[in-house]
């Protein structure tokens, strides 16, 4: 659930989005997806104002992830849409399980490091247990079948990105069952995004105008 700080920020952002919608200031898909992103960032525990530093908000998402991790065995893929989240997750996992246990894989990861991370993750003898990646970067074309758990810290509204990232652990060579876990804040945009993805709906093409209002209310 959201913390009181998150609830306050979420309600304020939602009301602002409704005002924009009523004033006709969200006539494009891009503007609506931007508001979706801002609401989702709050559920993840931060606010990123335009041209301003990230403002962390007290949240339960990271503790919830650590509780999930404590209950699983083996290697895990953790997908997160925002670099800020990837860095926070890696820091928490490194503190709990050791720096060698975790690797970040996102747009700023050096090309030379990317293959090395994949090789180490796939090596059952390697201490690298947690692959924390952005689905747009790590979700395409690489094999990560060493994982038996896939956790979505948050979800992109891009259906193709979700499907591709799911497949990283479920490719040829996977000999065990894979558990998929979604971290979701109840009664927020998180639930709407996950519901759409499970229904194989690409939000980037469908959420406009009154559809978006229905999501907010």
What are these regions (language model features)?
Residues 76-78, 89-92, 121, 149-151, ...:
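A generic "structured core" feature
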Residues 9-13, 92, 117, 146, ...:
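Alpha-helical scaffold elements adjacent to nucleotide-binding pockets in ATP/GTP-utilizing enzyme cores
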Residues 142-155, 178-182:
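A short beta-strand element within the Helicase C-terminal
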Residues 106-110, 154-159:
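Short, acidic/turn-prone active-site loops that include or flank metal/cofactor-
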Residues 1-142, 209-217:
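Conserved Helicase C-terminal RecA-like lobe
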Residues 157-217:
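A conserved SF2-helicase RecA2
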Residues 1, 82, 117-118, 152-156, ...:
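Bulky hydrophobic/aromatic packing residues
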């Amino acid at each position: 659930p959201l913390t009181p700080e998150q609830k306050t920020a979420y309600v304020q952002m939602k009301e602002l989005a409704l005002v924009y919608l009523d004033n006709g200031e969200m006539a494009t898909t891009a503007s609506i997806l931007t508001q979706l992103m801002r609401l989702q960032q709050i559920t993840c525990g931060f606010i990123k104002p335009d041209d301003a530093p990230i403002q962390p908000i007290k949240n339960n998402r990271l503790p919830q992830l650590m509780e999930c991790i404590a209950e699983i065995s083996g290697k895990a893929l953790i997908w997160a849409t925002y670099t800020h989240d990837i860095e926070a997750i890696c820091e928490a996992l490194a503190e709990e399980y050791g720096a060698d246990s975790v690797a970040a894989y996102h747009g700023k990861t050096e090309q030379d490091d990317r293959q090395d991370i994949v090789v180490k993750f796939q090596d059952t003898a390697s201490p690298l247990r947690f692959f924390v990646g952005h689905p747009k970067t790590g979700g395409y074309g690489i094999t990560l079948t060493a994982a038996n758990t896939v956790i979505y810290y948050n979800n992109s509204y891009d259906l193709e990105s979700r499907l591709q990232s799911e497949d990283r652990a479920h490719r040829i060579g996977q000999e065990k069952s894979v558990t998929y876990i979604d971290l979701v804040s109840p009664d927020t945009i998180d639930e709407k995004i996950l519901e759409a993805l499970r229904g194989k709906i690409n939000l980037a093409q469908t959420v406009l105008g009154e559809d978006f209002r229905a999501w907010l209310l």
